[in-house]
Amino acid sequence: MDLSSKPQQQLLNSLPIAGELTVTGEMGVCYKECLKNHAANLGGHALDGCGEFMPSPTATSTDPSSLRCAACGCHRNFHRRDPSENLNFLTAPPISSPSGTESPPSRHVSSPVPCSYYTSAPPHHVILSLSSGFPGPSDQDPTVVRSENSSRGAMRKRTRTKFTPEQKIKMRAFAEKAGWKINGCDEKSVREFCNEVGIERGVLKVWMHNNKYSLLNGKIREIEHGLCLNTHSNDGDGSSSS
């Protein structure tokens, strides 16, 4: 009694035979993602996102022009040719023998799908490298960035203390009396002077350091000018007496 059925026989006939030339490509050759540049006329680079060549149902191996991808519509030549990956062929399901004993399982095991199959395919969307027109970080005006940085630096900069003319006169008199050195002065007198003028000790110390040489040079020039005037007046008195 023949236990084989027609559906099982039809399934066996429809399976591809290992080593047979398929529509996908040559034996042991796979065609991966589509590399056709759809933005070549615009001077850019755009892919359609097709990750693997899918043969069209109407394609025949005798007509090369019919070898178009059913997913993206591009010819097989636009897809990346990968000869390193072999085609995986389906194995027929085990058929019960007439004696009722199960046949041993087939030793043919399909090779696992390589990891490069999942990582090599680009995302399924159009990738455009053309400029979108929106300002990015590199499109910002450098003057605006510099002005922002300068404004932050100005905020961090210490504000200068402004003194009234009366405060300047009193601080100059105190500095001349102390010899332009605050460290050698009596701390009690320094605190009393700072409370009287309305400044802090550190402010007085900085002011004395910044104005020591300028005011001393000005005072020296005043003394020299006075000596010159006295010399001229003495010369005039001597000439008139003679």
Swiss-Prot record:
Q: Which PROSITE patterns match?
A: ZF_HD_DIMER (PS51523)
Molecular function terms from GO:
DNA binding; DNA-binding transcription factor activity; protein homodimerization activity; transcription cis-regulatory region binding; zinc ion binding
Residues annotated as DNA-binding are 156-213
* Major location category of this protein: nucleus
Observed effect of gene inactivation: No visible phenotype. Increased sensitivity to salt stress.
- The protein's site described by Required for DNA-binding is found at M208
The answer to whether UniProt assigns keyword Nucleotide-binding to this entry is no
Q: Would you kindly state one Gene Ontology biological process term found in this protein's UniProt entry?
A: response to water deprivation
The subunit field of the Swiss-Prot or TrEMBL record says:
Homo- and heterodimer with other ZFHD proteins. Interacts with HIPP20, HIPP21, HIPP22, HIPP23, HIPP24, HIPP26, HIPP27, HIPP30 and MED25 (via ACID domain). Interacts with NAC019, NAC055 and NAC072 (via NAC binding domain). Binds to ZHD1, ZHD2, ZHD3, ZHD4, ZHD5, ZHD6, ZHD7, ZHD8, ZHD9, ZHD12, ZHD13 and ZHD14.
Against NCBIfam families, the record matches this protein to: homeo_ZF_HD, ZF_HD_prot_N
Q: What is this protein called?
A: Zinc-finger homeodomain protein 11
